[in-house]
Amino acid sequence: MQRIALYPGSFDPVTNGHLDVVRQAVHLCDKLIVAVGVHHGKKPLFSTEERLAMAHEVFGPVASAAGCAFDASTYDNLTVTAAQQAGAILMIRGLRDGTDLDYEMQLAGMNQTMAPSIQTVFVPASVPVRPITASLVRQIAAMGGEISHFVPPSVVAPLKAKFA
């Protein structure tokens, strides 16, 4: 049986924190699916297509180097439903701090009630990337700050261009 893991998020933009989670997650599964959430009530900075392209460009080579199959797709339903539809048995969630843990434990409990066969796996963020959030990265970029410490190199120019 192939161990498929789903790593959901908005990825707006892809950050070094996301990359850190993927670097760990590819060793936990045979196939990793990055699921880009489409929330019709939100206006993301990057289009769905741009976020998918970033995911493929940044995460694909990491998965390949680890011998893990990779795909990126979108979803606009419950995350647990997207995981079921993908055939996932694991849902990957990154944790930066205790606040993340409290929130993620609540979600994991709800998801386990709805889909008992899908296990949530918490991946602790490495120390250097713990403070990184996509919303802070967007704010720094909007104010002309240096973002290269927070996002992969291939994301720097597209992110700067959004505020040029």
Curated annotation (Swiss-Prot):
Site entry (Transition state stabilizer), positions: H18
Q: Which reaction does it catalyse?
A: (R)-4'-phosphopantetheine + ATP + H(+) = 3'-dephospho-CoA + diphosphate
Q: Does the keyword tRNA processing apply?
A: no
Summarizing the function annotation, the protein's role is: Reversibly transfers an adenylyl group from ATP to 4'-phosphopantetheine, yielding dephospho-CoA (dPCoA) and pyrophosphate.
Organism, by scientific name, is Bradyrhizobium sp. (strain ORS 278)
EC number(s) per entry: 2.7.7.3
For binding ATP, which residues are annotated in this chain's numbering?
S10, F11, H18, G94, L95, R96, E104, V129, R130, P131, I132, T133, A134, S135
Binding residue positions for substrate: S10, K42, T79, R93
Q: What is its main location?
A: cytoplasm
User: What does the subunit section of this Swiss-Prot or TrEMBL entry state?
Assistant: Homohexamer.
- Which GO terms fall under molecular function for this chain's record? ATP binding; pantetheine-phosphate adenylyltransferase activity
The UniProt similarity line reads: Belongs to the bacterial CoaD family.
| GO BP annotations, alphabetical order | coenzyme A biosynthetic process
The protein's required cofactor(s) are namely: Mg(2+)
Listed pathway(s): Cofactor biosynthesis; coenzyme A biosynthesis; CoA from (R)-pantothenate: step 4/5
This protein's UniProt keywords: ATP-binding, Coenzyme A biosynthesis, Cytoplasm, Magnesium, Nucleotide-binding, Nucleotidyltransferase, Transferase
GO cellular-component term (any): cytoplasm
Transmembrane stretches, start-end = none
Q: Name one Pfam family in it.
A: CTP_transf_like
Q: Where in the cell is it found?
A: Cytoplasm
Query: According to the UniProt record, which cysteines are disulfide-bonded?
Result: none
Q: What is this protein called?
A: Phosphopantetheine adenylyltransferase
